[in-house]
Amino acid sequence: MTNTMKENSNYDIIDVIIENVTKEWEESMKNNSINKEKWEVPKYSKSEINKAGKIIANPKSSKEDRDNALVILNNWRASHAYPLQVICTNLRRKNPNAIVVQRLKRLESITGKIERFPEMQLYKMQDLGGCRVIVETIDQVYEAVRKYKKSYIKHIFKKENDYIKNPKESGYRSYHMVYKFYSDKKETYNNNMLIEIQFRTKLQHVWATAVEMMGIYTKSNLKASQGDKEILRFFTIVSSIFAIQENMPTCPNTPRFMEDLIPEMKELNEKHKILDILSALKVSIDYTTKLNFKNKNLYYLLILDYIKGKVQIRSFPTSKVELATKVYDNIEKSSTKDVVLVSATSFDTLKFAYPNYFVDISDFIDTLQSIITGYENDLKEDKLIEQQILKKNS
């Protein structure tokens, strides 16, 4: 443990949680049969799961009701780990050059979604388990989508949304597919386990990351279109600028051409200093001695304390995924830190796919500034050519 961690009581709390949960889990493993499943299985009915979602999203719920509901929700969420692992492993095989990562949805995101959409049922929430495929180009996005659709899988296709050709008003761009998991070998998971797959380019990914980081700074859920309207507008405008770079449609209610988009973006940035804020965000990373970067089958707990500028990382082998989900559940209940449980094939992949937990916005800023510089150089060149023509004809 680093000296920083020893001196920081908040980090001590995290370590105590991990130590206590690990002891309980190891004891339960001793008491159970040798062939105990390493993957969590669903234990509750559809009605119990939906009721739990409503209780947790209701601020008037009693502590006892909420605690009982959390047990149900955590089991339902953790049960998605196995279907998610199967689908993401398949995606990695089909897309060896892509960055493929997976995550179980954060409790705060689950409750926030139910609060925003009161009619939503937790049992039918389509992104409790999410897999993200990140590639270089638009063509590679559609090729990855095509390959997965044509593959011989037994999972049941439920829906798709092309937010690249039809961007959201917020500026969000990605290609989504939802499948209902099916297995001949693990029938216990054939129980409406929905997995969402997101296909996106690196440019779309760095935009989404910047939105999330600015949301943390402003303490508003910008990615759900909540917060300062002008800051939201800035990111929508930037998304349209990026869309033009990828030769794709711009976002609704934004100009269609760079000569209109860039001046508006610069005006909003000048007013709110958004790029300066993003550039200034930094954290120090405590990797801890518990990480093993040589192991390619790891689950990572990313624990971000933005106020103190610290991020902790804990790793778990796939054989201990049940322990990882239990630690995840307990940290969410006992700490105010921003925490997520994810899986990636390497640390570099992890860092690129979740840069918001490492506060690395450099790709977003560098790309945007490069586009602006290129646009301004083109304007200067056009003006120079025009002056030369006028001089020649005078």
Kindly give the residue locations of the regions a language model identified.
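An acidic, glycine-/histidine-flanked metal-binding catalytic module
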Residues: 4-69, 73-79, 190-300, 304
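Surface-exposed, low-hydrophobicity interaction/linker segments
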Residues: 65-116, 310-311
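Short, flexible, solvent-exposed loop/turn segments with mixed acidic/basic and small polar residues
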Residues: 115-126, 302-303, 329-331
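Short Gly/Thr-rich strand-loop-strand
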Residues: 148, 154-186
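A short, exposed loop/beta-hairpin motif centered on an aromatic-Gly-Thr core
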Residues: 310-319, 339-342
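A short, charged, amphipathic alpha-helix used as a generic interaction element across diverse proteins
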Residues: 320-333
